From Swiss-Prot:
Single GO cellular component term: mitochondrial outer membrane
Organism placement in taxonomy: Eukaryota, Metazoa, Ecdysozoa, Arthropoda, Hexapoda
Record-given protein name: Protein NipSnap
GO biological process terms on file: mitochondrion organization; mitophagy; oxidative phosphorylation
InterPro entries per record: Dimeric_a/b-barrel (IPR011008), NIPSNAP (IPR012577), NipSnap_domain (IPR051557)
Taxonomic superkingdom: Eukaryota
Protein family (similarity comment): Belongs to the NipSnap family.
Length: 273
């Protein structure tokens, strides 16, 4: 009886050893995959994240206007006149319109306007003061309020590793992919996308990349330019076929709390078409 018990104990020990050996590679693979889902610790720094990721002397203002459905034409005419007025004062205001869009897929009856200020927040303060003392500008704002349901403003900084913003010509559509990140992960996002952006340059689709400075914080906006929705599909599929792109995505997905995309069409007065 004792010998039988000993044999069973040895057999159980051997089975455990075999089971352990047979599952080790699977566990290692699982741990390797799972490690990509963990947010890595970023070492403390005495520099602000914005200073490490961007040129703080160039600030972008993203105006989001939700327009009454029956007033889109009147609204666009009003804003076109406003842009012309500001262009006349461009030298004093140190600002210029980069692009202007209407939303085609996503938040309908919505318009986005991207302005660039050179000289930091000092120039923004100066421009606001000058415009608020301009009767024509105030009249246009008052008229525009009749066409709006709501509006929102964010001040943004451009990621330094993205290509320089260049106006596009011809017929294009744009996609704005907006992300709300977990607080404290902006540097890790930047480190990963500094590599990932190299996989998205083959079709010249990268238009602009921003993160929020004032307004909704821990917001990131990536703006892509395509010839059509079909061109978008083919360009994105080509990126997924590039070795390394999937790994970049795997590291950035855990940093995201929320994301959404909008397909945009440039307005007739947008500098970038």
């Amino acid at each position: 009886m004792l010998k039988l018990r000993n044999l069973l104990a040895v057999g159980k020990s051997n089975n455990n050893a075999v089971r352990s050996l047979s599952t080790t590679p699977s566990r290692n693979d699982s741990e390797s995959w799972f490690s990509k889902l963990l947010v890595r610790k970023i070492e403390p720094t005495k520099e602000s994240h914005s200073r490490m990721l961007s040129d703080k002397e160039i600030i972008y203002a993203l105006h989001t206007h939700n327009v009454r459905p029956d007033s889109m034409g009147s609204y666009l005419n009003n804003y076109k006149t406003t842009v012309a007025l500001i262009n006349e004062k461009k030298a004093n205001l140190s600002c210029e319109l980069v692009a202007s869009w209407t939303v085609q897929v996503g938040d309908m009856d919505q318009c986005l306007h991207l302005w660039k200020y050179t000289g930091g927040f000092e120039k923004i303060d100066q421009a606001k003061e000058d415009l608020w003392n301009d009767p024509e500008y105030l009249s246009l704002m008052q008229e525009r309020s009749k066409f709006l349901r709501s509006r929102h403003l964010q001040y943004l900084l451009a990621f330094s590793y993205w290509p320089q913003i260049a106006s596009r010509t011809g017929k294009n559509i744009y996609e704005m992919r907006s992300y709300r990140l977990t607080p404290g992960t902006m540097i890790e996002w930047g480190n990963n996308w500094a590599r990932a952006i190299n996989y998205r340059k083959h079709n010249n689709e990268a238009f602009a990349g921003f993160f929020s400075q004032i307004g909704r914080l821990y917001n990131v906006h990536h703006i892509w330019c395509y010839k059509s929705l079909q061109d978008r599909k083919e360009t994105r599929e080509a990126a997924w076929r590039s070795p390394g792109w999937d790994e970049c995505v795997a590291y950035t997905v855990p940093l995201i709390r929320e994301m959404h995309c909008r397909v945009l069409a440039p307005t007739e007065f947008s500098p970038s078409q």
